[in-house]
């Protein structure tokens, strides 16, 4: 099953938390969900050059806090905060709730699966060889200290008549192990030959429970 499902969704409630954190019932749940989807799409489109890795949302009463994880916070914040003020004003027009924006920097974009996928997609659109782009991204991730990385690229590679999928991986990526911290990202690249799809899995190590950490300490002592 670990091979087929989204590895982040599989681990929610085990070692991962939800990107949208709020509680609602009935019609309010429906409205909140659709508003989250609409806001995420707007922010991803608006900040497509800012290297946005993740957008989290928290709600309380009539307030919504949006946490944007980005590799280029300066692009979002702008000179003297003018960028984030303008962005907040635009987001506020899309929701009746009071909006609060929080910007978090992704210090190691080479270790973030979503940013790696988008980086490769951008390189393919610039007509860089897909093999070269994949190998470069894998080398950067391994150098950064990941425990394993796997990339799948699908489409009319090298302009071939028939679409195919290619896999590149380095070290292990244990998809079936729920305590394994696996990041996952997808992206699409619009090339002259059609759309190239990308999927990236990055294994960062195991997340142990407090009990497991205590037991491991006893074994070492």
Curated annotation (Swiss-Prot):
Binds the lower part of the 30S subunit head. Binds mRNA in the 70S ribosome, positioning it for translation. The keyword Membrane does not apply. It holds the Pfam family KH_2. PANTHER family: 30S/40S RIBOSOMAL PROTEIN S3, SMALL RIBOSOMAL SUBUNIT PROTEIN US3C. This is Small ribosomal subunit protein uS3. The gene is rpsC. One of its GO terms (biological process) is translation. HAMAP family: Ribosomal_uS3_B. The keyword Lipoprotein does not apply. PROSITE patterns: KH_TYPE_2. InterPro entries: KH_dom (IPR004087), KH_dom-like_a/b (IPR015946), KH_dom_type_2 (IPR004044), KH_sf_prok-type (IPR009019), Ribosomal_S3_C_sf (IPR036419), Ribosomal_uS3_bac-typ (IPR005704), Ribosomal_uS3_C (IPR001351). Residues 39-107 form the KH type-2 domain. Part of the 30S ribosomal subunit. Forms a tight complex with proteins S10 and S14. NCBIfam families: rpsC_bact. Belongs to the universal ribosomal protein uS3 family. Keywords: Ribonucleoprotein, Ribosomal protein, RNA-binding, rRNA-binding. GO terms for cellular component: cytosolic small ribosomal subunit. GO terms for molecular function: mRNA binding; rRNA binding; structural constituent of ribosome.
